[in-house]
């Protein structure tokens, strides 16, 4: 998978604090619904912690929330998607230097429209 290779590749990793919260909630829901065992739940949380330690985590600021409230190239999108996209824009890096790793089609379409590379 290209995404896993990119996550493990050398270079700086940046993610939104929202990513960590969303992933923690998804892992918890999977455990509480019985889709994963307690052991799998613990392993997933450890993996998330390792990932978070390797990343610069960007806080969800008022500036990001304000940008998230404005239109994006491909609408409609959900609020959390808008926050992720606004976070990428807030980095202030030329889009050609940023790779967005996502499975979400709405993030993918908007990232491409904004000039970011997507995996």
Where are these regions (language model features)?
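Metal-dependent nucleic-acid phosphoesterase active-site entry motif
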Residues: 1, 52-55
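Short, well-structured N-terminal submotif of metal-dependent ribonuclease cores
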Residues: 1-20, 30-44, 116
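Acidic, PIN/NYN-like endoribonuclease modules and their adjacent C-terminal/linker elements
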Residues: 7, 16, 20-22, 85-86, ...
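Hydrophobic core segments within long, regular secondary-structure runs in both alpha-
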Residues: 42-49, 65, 108
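Active-site neighborhoods of divalent-metal-dependent phosphate/nucleic-acid chemistry enzymes
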Residues: 54-106
